[in-house]
Protein backbone atom coordinates (compact mmCIF):
# COMPACT_ATOMS: atom_id res chain seq x y z
CA UNK A 1 0.00 0.00 0.00
CA UNK A 2 1.24 3.45 -0.90
CA UNK A 3 0.50 6.33 1.49
CA UNK A 4 0.06 9.66 -0.29
CA UNK A 5 -0.37 13.04 1.37
CA UNK A 6 -0.73 15.50 -1.51
CA UNK A 7 -3.41 15.99 -4.15
CA UNK A 8 -0.89 16.24 -7.00
CA UNK A 9 0.85 12.99 -6.08
CA UNK A 10 -2.41 11.05 -5.81
CA UNK A 11 -3.67 12.38 -9.13
CA UNK A 12 -0.41 11.37 -10.79
CA UNK A 13 -0.64 7.79 -9.51
CA UNK A 14 -4.34 7.40 -10.31
CA UNK A 15 -3.96 8.89 -13.81
CA UNK A 16 -1.59 6.01 -14.56
CA UNK A 17 -4.16 3.52 -13.26
CA UNK A 18 -6.88 5.00 -15.45
CA UNK A 19 -4.62 4.97 -18.53
CA UNK A 20 -4.06 1.27 -17.87
CA UNK A 21 -7.84 0.78 -17.95
CA UNK A 22 -8.16 -0.02 -14.26
CA UNK A 23 -11.38 0.79 -12.40
CA UNK A 24 -11.06 2.72 -9.14
CA UNK A 25 -13.08 2.12 -5.99
CA UNK A 26 -13.00 4.76 -3.26
CA UNK A 27 -13.67 4.53 0.49
CA UNK A 28 -13.62 7.98 2.15
CA UNK A 29 -13.25 7.92 5.95
CA UNK A 30 -12.30 10.11 8.89
CA UNK A 31 -10.10 7.38 10.29
CA UNK A 32 -10.09 5.46 13.56
CA UNK A 33 -11.29 2.53 11.53
CA UNK A 34 -13.52 -0.34 12.62
CA UNK A 35 -14.91 -3.44 10.96
CA UNK A 36 -17.61 -1.41 9.25
CA UNK A 37 -14.95 0.51 7.32
CA UNK A 38 -13.20 -2.73 6.43
CA UNK A 39 -16.46 -4.07 4.99
CA UNK A 40 -16.54 -1.05 2.68
CA UNK A 41 -12.96 -1.80 1.61
CA UNK A 42 -13.84 -5.45 1.02
CA UNK A 43 -16.69 -4.52 -1.32
CA UNK A 44 -14.60 -1.90 -3.12
CA UNK A 45 -11.87 -4.48 -3.72
CA UNK A 46 -14.38 -7.03 -4.99
CA UNK A 47 -15.74 -4.60 -7.59
CA UNK A 48 -12.65 -2.66 -8.73
CA UNK A 49 -9.08 -3.19 -9.89
CA UNK A 50 -7.72 -0.42 -7.65
CA UNK A 51 -8.91 0.54 -4.18
CA UNK A 52 -8.27 3.97 -2.67
CA UNK A 53 -9.10 4.88 0.93
CA UNK A 54 -8.86 8.35 2.40
CA UNK A 55 -8.42 9.46 5.99
CA UNK A 56 -9.26 13.10 6.63
CA UNK A 57 -10.95 14.56 9.70
CA UNK A 58 -12.88 17.26 7.89
CA UNK A 59 -13.23 20.46 9.95
CA UNK A 60 -16.04 21.76 7.72
CA UNK A 61 -18.50 19.18 9.05
CA UNK A 62 -17.95 19.89 12.74
CA UNK A 63 -20.02 22.59 14.41
CA UNK A 64 -19.10 24.84 17.29
CA UNK A 65 -18.68 22.82 20.48
CA UNK A 66 -18.51 19.48 18.64
CA UNK A 67 -15.69 16.95 18.91
CA UNK A 68 -13.27 18.07 16.16
CA UNK A 69 -10.29 18.34 18.50
CA UNK A 70 -10.94 15.12 20.40
CA UNK A 71 -12.10 13.01 17.44
CA UNK A 72 -9.99 9.82 17.70
CA UNK A 73 -6.96 9.72 15.42
CA UNK A 74 -4.38 6.96 14.95
CA UNK A 75 -2.91 7.00 11.45
CA UNK A 76 -0.36 4.26 12.15
CA UNK A 77 -3.07 1.88 13.39
CA UNK A 78 -5.37 2.74 10.51
CA UNK A 79 -2.59 2.35 7.93
CA UNK A 80 -1.81 -1.14 9.18
CA UNK A 81 -5.49 -2.11 9.02
CA UNK A 82 -5.90 -0.80 5.48
CA UNK A 83 -2.71 -2.44 4.25
CA UNK A 84 -3.82 -5.77 5.73
CA UNK A 85 -7.20 -5.32 4.00
CA UNK A 86 -5.49 -4.90 0.63
CA UNK A 87 -5.95 -1.19 -0.06
CA UNK A 88 -3.69 0.05 -2.87
CA UNK A 89 -3.51 3.75 -2.01
CA UNK A 90 -4.17 5.60 1.23
CA UNK A 91 -4.76 9.33 0.76
CA UNK A 92 -4.03 11.03 4.09
CA UNK A 93 -3.89 14.79 3.50
CA UNK A 94 -3.57 17.46 6.15
CA UNK A 95 -6.00 20.35 6.50
CA UNK A 96 -3.51 22.62 4.70
CA UNK A 97 -3.47 20.20 1.75
CA UNK A 98 -7.25 20.07 1.44
CA UNK A 99 -7.96 23.69 2.36
CA UNK A 100 -4.86 25.81 1.62
CA UNK A 101 -7.06 28.88 2.01
CA UNK A 102 -10.55 29.40 3.48
CA UNK A 103 -13.17 27.71 1.34
CA UNK A 104 -15.34 30.17 -0.58
CA UNK A 105 -17.25 27.40 -2.34
CA UNK A 106 -19.81 25.35 -0.43
CA UNK A 107 -21.94 22.47 -1.69
CA UNK A 108 -25.23 22.51 0.18
CA UNK A 109 -28.45 20.53 -0.11
CA UNK A 110 -30.65 22.56 2.26
CA UNK A 111 -33.75 20.42 1.79
CA UNK A 112 -32.25 17.01 2.51
CA UNK A 113 -29.45 18.36 4.70
CA UNK A 114 -31.40 20.80 6.84
CA UNK A 115 -33.58 18.34 8.73
CA UNK A 116 -33.23 15.32 11.00
CA UNK A 117 -29.53 15.06 11.96
CA UNK A 118 -28.91 18.23 9.93
CA UNK A 119 -31.38 20.18 12.07
CA UNK A 120 -29.56 19.03 15.20
CA UNK A 121 -26.18 19.86 13.58
CA UNK A 122 -26.58 23.01 11.44
CA UNK A 123 -24.07 23.15 8.59
CA UNK A 124 -22.92 19.57 9.09
CA UNK A 125 -24.13 18.18 5.78
CA UNK A 126 -22.90 21.19 3.81
CA UNK A 127 -19.46 20.34 5.20
CA UNK A 128 -19.90 16.69 4.23
CA UNK A 129 -21.13 17.46 0.71
CA UNK A 130 -18.32 19.96 0.14
CA UNK A 131 -15.51 17.63 1.20
CA UNK A 132 -16.98 14.64 -0.66
CA UNK A 133 -17.26 16.74 -3.82
CA UNK A 134 -13.61 17.76 -3.47
CA UNK A 135 -12.51 14.18 -2.79
CA UNK A 136 -14.47 12.95 -5.82
CA UNK A 137 -12.75 15.59 -7.95
CA UNK A 138 -9.34 14.49 -6.64
CA UNK A 139 -9.81 10.71 -6.83
CA UNK A 140 -12.27 10.56 -9.77
CA UNK A 141 -13.46 7.10 -8.71
CA UNK A 142 -15.72 4.83 -10.69
CA UNK A 143 -17.51 3.87 -7.47
CA UNK A 144 -17.55 5.17 -3.89
CA UNK A 145 -18.62 3.18 -0.84
CA UNK A 146 -20.53 4.47 2.19
CA UNK A 147 -22.04 2.76 5.23
CA UNK A 148 -25.81 2.78 5.62
CA UNK A 149 -25.48 3.66 9.31
CA UNK A 150 -25.17 7.23 8.04
CA UNK A 151 -28.41 6.88 6.07
CA UNK A 152 -29.12 10.58 5.63
CA UNK A 153 -25.55 11.19 4.52
CA UNK A 154 -25.84 8.49 1.86
CA UNK A 155 -29.13 10.00 0.62
CA UNK A 156 -27.50 13.43 0.38
CA UNK A 157 -24.45 12.15 -1.50
CA UNK A 158 -26.60 10.19 -3.94
CA UNK A 159 -28.76 13.25 -4.63
CA UNK A 160 -25.66 15.46 -5.01
CA UNK A 161 -24.11 13.04 -7.49
CA UNK A 162 -27.37 12.89 -9.45
CA UNK A 163 -27.99 16.66 -9.42
CA UNK A 164 -24.43 17.51 -10.50
CA UNK A 165 -24.09 14.63 -13.00
CA UNK A 166 -20.98 13.29 -11.29
CA UNK A 167 -19.73 10.11 -13.01
CA UNK A 168 -19.54 8.17 -9.74
CA UNK A 169 -21.56 5.14 -8.68
CA UNK A 170 -22.54 5.56 -5.02
CA UNK A 171 -22.67 2.18 -3.29
CA UNK A 172 -24.43 1.92 0.10
CA UNK A 173 -23.16 -0.94 2.27
CA UNK A 174 -25.20 -2.52 5.07
CA UNK A 175 -24.47 -1.42 8.64
CA UNK A 176 -22.01 -3.62 10.52
CA UNK A 177 -22.87 -4.26 14.18
CA UNK A 178 -21.18 -5.36 17.36
CA UNK A 179 -22.28 -8.61 19.01
CA UNK A 180 -24.88 -6.78 21.15
CA UNK A 181 -26.42 -5.03 18.14
CA UNK A 182 -24.80 -1.59 18.53
CA UNK A 183 -23.80 -0.16 15.16
CA UNK A 184 -20.03 0.07 14.68
CA UNK A 185 -18.87 3.68 14.98
CA UNK A 186 -15.56 5.44 15.59
CA UNK A 187 -17.33 7.43 18.32
CA UNK A 188 -18.14 4.29 20.32
CA UNK A 189 -14.66 4.68 21.81
CA UNK A 190 -15.97 7.68 23.78
CA UNK A 191 -18.42 5.52 25.74
CA UNK A 192 -17.64 4.37 29.26
CA UNK A 193 -18.45 0.76 30.13
CA UNK A 194 -21.72 1.88 31.71
CA UNK A 195 -22.61 4.10 28.75
CA UNK A 196 -21.72 1.31 26.34
CA UNK A 197 -24.30 -0.92 28.03
CA UNK A 198 -26.87 1.90 27.95
CA UNK A 199 -26.24 2.48 24.24
CA UNK A 200 -27.87 -0.81 23.33
CA UNK A 201 -31.20 0.99 23.79
CA UNK A 202 -30.63 2.35 20.27
CA UNK A 203 -30.75 -0.94 18.33
CA UNK A 204 -33.40 -2.19 20.77
CA UNK A 205 -35.59 0.76 19.71
CA UNK A 206 -35.35 -0.44 16.11
CA UNK A 207 -36.54 -3.86 17.23
CA UNK A 208 -39.36 -2.12 19.11
CA UNK A 209 -40.41 -0.33 15.91
CA UNK A 210 -40.74 -3.69 14.15
CA UNK A 211 -42.71 -5.08 17.09
CA UNK A 212 -45.09 -2.12 17.16
CA UNK A 213 -45.68 -2.33 13.43
CA UNK A 214 -46.40 -6.06 13.60
CA UNK A 215 -48.78 -5.34 16.50
CA UNK A 216 -50.80 -3.06 14.22
CA UNK A 217 -49.43 0.45 14.77
CA UNK A 218 -49.86 2.43 11.54
CA UNK A 219 -49.87 6.09 12.59
CA UNK A 220 -46.48 7.76 12.06
CA UNK A 221 -46.78 10.28 14.90
CA UNK A 222 -47.85 7.53 17.28
CA UNK A 223 -44.87 5.39 16.23
CA UNK A 224 -42.41 8.27 16.71
CA UNK A 225 -43.82 9.10 20.14
CA UNK A 226 -43.73 5.47 21.23
CA UNK A 227 -40.10 5.06 20.16
CA UNK A 228 -39.04 8.30 21.86
CA UNK A 229 -40.69 7.08 25.07
CA UNK A 230 -39.02 3.68 24.71
CA UNK A 231 -35.57 5.27 24.38
CA UNK A 232 -36.26 7.64 27.28
CA UNK A 233 -36.69 4.64 29.58
CA UNK A 234 -32.89 4.47 29.57
CA UNK A 235 -31.83 7.27 31.97
CA UNK A 236 -28.57 7.92 30.10
CA UNK A 237 -30.23 8.23 26.69
CA UNK A 238 -31.53 11.46 25.19
CA UNK A 239 -33.35 11.02 21.86
CA UNK A 240 -32.40 14.02 19.68
CA UNK A 241 -34.07 12.64 16.55
CA UNK A 242 -36.71 9.93 16.32
CA UNK A 243 -38.16 10.01 12.83
CA UNK A 244 -40.15 7.79 10.50
CA UNK A 245 -39.57 8.66 6.85
CA UNK A 246 -39.76 7.43 3.27
CA UNK A 247 -36.64 5.30 2.74
CA UNK A 248 -35.80 6.80 -0.68
CA UNK A 249 -36.75 10.47 -0.36
CA UNK A 250 -36.70 10.97 3.45
CA UNK A 251 -40.13 12.59 3.04
CA UNK A 252 -42.59 12.39 5.91
CA UNK A 253 -45.17 9.60 5.89
CA UNK A 254 -48.56 10.13 7.56
CA UNK A 255 -49.34 6.41 7.58
CA UNK A 256 -47.21 3.29 7.60
CA UNK A 257 -48.69 1.62 4.55
CA UNK A 258 -45.40 1.18 2.65
CA UNK A 259 -41.77 0.36 3.54
CA UNK A 260 -40.55 2.98 5.99
CA UNK A 261 -37.29 4.17 7.50
CA UNK A 262 -36.82 4.57 11.24
CA UNK A 263 -33.97 7.01 11.85
CA UNK A 264 -32.52 7.58 15.32
CA UNK A 265 -29.99 10.11 16.61
CA UNK A 266 -29.49 9.49 20.32
CA UNK A 267 -27.16 11.10 22.84
CA UNK A 268 -25.55 8.83 25.44
CA UNK A 269 -23.56 10.97 27.86
CA UNK A 270 -21.84 13.43 25.53
CA UNK A 271 -21.70 10.97 22.62
CA UNK A 272 -24.27 11.06 19.82
CA UNK A 273 -25.07 7.80 18.08
CA UNK A 274 -26.83 7.23 14.76
CA UNK A 275 -28.80 4.18 13.72
CA UNK A 276 -31.64 3.27 11.40
CA UNK A 277 -33.62 0.47 9.89
CA UNK A 278 -35.85 0.13 6.87
CA UNK A 279 -38.93 -1.84 7.87
CA UNK A 280 -40.54 -3.62 4.98
CA UNK A 281 -44.26 -4.15 4.70
CA UNK A 282 -45.24 -7.76 4.23
CA UNK A 283 -48.28 -8.76 2.25
CA UNK A 284 -51.06 -10.59 4.07
CA UNK A 285 -49.96 -13.80 2.35
CA UNK A 286 -46.32 -13.35 3.46
CA UNK A 287 -47.37 -12.49 6.99
CA UNK A 288 -49.47 -15.65 7.20
CA UNK A 289 -46.63 -17.91 6.06
Swiss-Prot record:
Positions that bind (R)-pantoate: 61, 153
Known catalytic reactions: (R)-pantoate + beta-alanine + ATP = (R)-pantothenate + AMP + diphosphate + H(+)
One GO biological process term: pantothenate biosynthetic process
InterPro entries tied to this protein: Cyt_trans-like, Pantoate_ligase, Pantoate_ligase_C, Rossmann-like_a/b/a_fold
Annotated pathway: Cofactor biosynthesis; (R)-pantothenate biosynthesis; (R)-pantothenate from (R)-pantoate and beta-alanine: step 1/1
Example of a GO MF term: pantoate-beta-alanine ligase activity
Short name of any one Pfam family annotated for the protein: Pantoate_ligase
Example of a GO cellular component annotation carried by this entry: cytosol
Localisation per UniProt entry: Cytoplasm
Record field: transmembrane: none
Binding site for beta-alanine: 61
Record: residues binding ATP: 30-37, 147-150, 176, 184-187
Assigned keywords, A-Z: ATP-binding, Cytoplasm, Ligase, Nucleotide-binding, Pantothenate biosynthesis
Top-rank taxon, per record: Bacteria
Active site per the UniProt annotation: 37 (proton donor)
EC number(s) stated in the UniProt entry for this protein: 6.3.2.1
Quaternary data: Homodimer.
PANTHER family per record: CYTIDYLATE KINASE/PANTOATE-BETA-ALANINE LIGASE, PANTOATE--BETA-ALANINE LIGASE
More details: The reaction proceeds by a bi uni uni bi ping pong mechanism.
Family as reported in the entry's similarity comment: Belongs to the pantothenate synthetase family.
Task of the protein: Catalyzes the condensation of pantoate with beta-alanine in an ATP-dependent reaction via a pantoyl-adenylate intermediate.
Protein name: Pantothenate synthetase
